Regions:
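Short phosphate-binding/catalytic loops that engage adenosine nucleotides
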Residues: 105-107, 181
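Conserved SAM-binding loop
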Residues: 24, 51, 107-110, 141, ...
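Short linear interaction motif-like sites in intrinsically disordered regions of transcription factors
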Residues: 36-39, 108, 196-197
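Asp-based, Mg2+/Mn2+-dependent phosphohydrolase catalytic module
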Residues: 1-14, 96, 100, 115-204
Length: 204
């Protein structure tokens, strides 16, 4: 049973570590299009679930689904699919304004996407590419391993315990908590996790 979230929560932190897809940017349509196109290419459309890749590195998903393929070749293919047609990608309401209101060096985007893809999606969604970005290219182990969020904290010159992670996927939430960060889940997909709070926009 999931505990009801408290009505008001005050967290004292010095830095914010934002996941990208599903938190700042809604890339669901683009993601589905790319993964389904990839699944069709490899004759997997009948057995593929679009929910399985969410929050994890594409190379890890490819390894799990098709260990016979070179995951880095397939990663590049997926990037190309997305670059060809990023339509449907948009910023979550209020996300750009929130980021603009924060001191530039007080926050980091920590994403399971490659840097090239992350920048494409942010630009298409109208969000300025940040000074600090941790992508899959920067780590040897992706979420749910804590390495991405540990690196995000280091980029701010902070301890993980001084940072708030904002996440929407179970893998990302586990990564934030394992890193020792305060961790906030912001999407109903995570109702199986004990910490969650639904959010439709960043205006409140």
């Amino acid at each position: 049973m999931v505990d009801d979230p408290p009505t008001d929560v005050i967290l004292y932190v010095r830095g914010a570590l934002f996941d990208m897809d599903g938190v700042l940017v809604d890339s669901t349509a683009s993601d589905e299009r790319c993964w389904l196109r990839w699944a069709q290419l490899h004759g997997m459309e009948g057995s593929f679930s679009i929910h399985s890749p969410h929050g994890r590195r594409a190379v890890d998903t490819v390894r799990a689904l098709r260990p016979d393929l070179d995951p880095y070749v397939e990663l590049r293919r997926l990037e190309d699919f997305d670059a060809e047609d990023p339509s449907g990608t948009s910023a979550l309401s209020g996300a750009a304004a929130l980021l603009a209101a924060l001191p530039t060096r007080s926050w980091v985007i920590v994403t399971s996407a490659p840097a090239r893809l992350a920048k494409t999606r942010l630009q298409f969604a109208g969000i300025t590419v940040p000074h600090n970005l941790v992508s899959v290219d920067d780590v040897s182990r992706g979420k749910p391993d804590p390495e991405p969020y540990e690196l995000g904290a280091r980029k701010l010159g902070l301890e993980p315990s001084e940072c708030l992670v904002i996440e929407d996927s179970p893998a990302g939430i586990k990564a934030g908590k394992a890193a020792g960060c305060k961790t906030l889940a912001v999407y109903p997909r995570t109702r199986s996790i004990r910490w969650w709070r639904p959010i439709g926009s960043f205006h409140r």
